[in-house]
């Protein structure tokens, strides 16, 4: 927080909040939420952290479908230039009959 120019008194006040202070109650959740916030400048890292830990508890935006995407789909050229391997890989990520689905979880994505 110091790197963003936040005053020391404000940092102390923030860290003293029960939703932030580690006190044995939901500590892993608190750490996960703070890590997610710390990744704010790097959205992809925050997205990965959320998928890895499940924190914070996020909901999909209205009109975004059922859920927040869990992975990026393969690029449009992959099935053109490497159809055999693309098909094998995309089949592993089939959800609801959709091959190469963004709703499929990768191996480290927390269920």
Please tell me what each predicted stretch does.
Residues 1-111:
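Acidic/polar-rich alpha-helix caps and helix-coil junctions
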């Amino acid at each position: 927080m110091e790197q963003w120019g936040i005053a020391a008194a404000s940092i102390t006040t923030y860290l003293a909040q029960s939703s932030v202070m580690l006190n044995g109650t939901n500590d892993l959740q608190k750490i996960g939420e703070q890590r997610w916030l710390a990744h704010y400048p790097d959205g992809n890292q925050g997205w990965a952290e959320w998928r890895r830990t499940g924190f914070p508890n996020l909901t999909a935006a209205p009109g975004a479908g059922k859920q927040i995407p869990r992975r990026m789909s393969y690029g449009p050229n992959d099935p053109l230039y490497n159809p055999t391997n693309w098909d094998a890989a995309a089949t592993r990520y089939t959800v609801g009959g959709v091959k190469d689905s963004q709703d499929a979880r990768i191996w480290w994505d927390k269920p």
